[in-house]
């Protein structure tokens, strides 16, 4: 409840959402505040404490795909002098875990911690296109919010887009969640069964020419990382 409320919750509001008494919600919140997991401001509204973020970072570091992808992505960031990111999809959200940015001929590693609807960004679409039918249906069957004029906010539009992504092997974002005039492209990282476990992307591309120039090396790095996870296109074609 607290994670879903950016403006925080009062004791009364939490009691209403949980369908419980104010005394019960007060005790729950007091315990969380005392343990350092929840913050309470001067207006007695409650918010998640940043400790949850540190726990999330530790959880992300346990993902094997990060250790495998990081050196490959660092190499391509240095070669092409363009920032890149690694993301996963959890539920209906794309969670950006790490990014690498060019810095004096090297690649600087940064931890990220923000989420975007899976259907409204390049990494999310790249992952969804190579996910199970059940995963795709869970997104397609939900209401799709239109964030910008470019957002694919109908089942038909998004279905066509995911099929295109699956055919070409990469996804493009031309301002579907936040239109700042730049583009992003992403490719899925596939496991031995051919299902996407993550995505890597180039972002901050300023024009169509830059976008098209960086798609081939991005596709290549996606194939290299996927092969490191056991994915092989020839085997996949045989076993389906």
Describe the predicted segments one by one.
Residues 234-240:
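Signal-transducing coiled-coil/dimerization helices and immediately adjacent hinge/linker segments
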Residues 154-228, 240:
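Extended hydrophobic
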Residues 24, 51, 68, 157, ...:
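Charged catalytic carboxylate motif
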């Amino acid at each position: 409840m607290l994670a879903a409320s950016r403006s925080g919750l009062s004791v009364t509001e939490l009691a209403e959402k949980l369908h419980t008494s104010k005394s019960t919600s007060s005790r729950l919140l007091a315990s969380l505040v005392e343990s350092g997991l929840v913050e309470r401001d001067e207006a007695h509204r409650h918010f998640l404490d940043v400790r949850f973020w540190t726990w999330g970072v530790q959880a992300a570091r346990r993902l094997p795909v990060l250790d495998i992808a990081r050196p490959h992505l660092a190499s391509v960031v240095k070669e092409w002098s363009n920032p890149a990111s690694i993301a996963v999809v959890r539920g209906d959200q794309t969670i950006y875990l790490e990014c690498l940015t060019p810095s004096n001929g090297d690649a600087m590693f940064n931890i990220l911690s923000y989420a975007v609807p899976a259907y409204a960004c390049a990494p999310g679409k790249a992952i969804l296109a190579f996910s199970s039918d059940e995963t795709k249906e869970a997104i397609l069957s939900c209401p799709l919010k239109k964030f910008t004029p470019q957002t694919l906010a109908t089942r038909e539009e998004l279905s066509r887009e995911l099929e295109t992504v699956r055919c070409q092997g990469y996804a493009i974002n031309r301002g579907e969640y936040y239109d700042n005039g730049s583009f992003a492209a992403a490719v899925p990282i596939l496991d031995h069964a051919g299902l996407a476990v993550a995505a890597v992307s180039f972002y901050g591309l300023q024009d169509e020419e830059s976008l098209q120039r960086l798609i081939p090396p991005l596709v290549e790095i996606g194939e290299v990382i996927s092969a490191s996870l056991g994915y092989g296109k020839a085997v996949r074609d045989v076993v389906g």
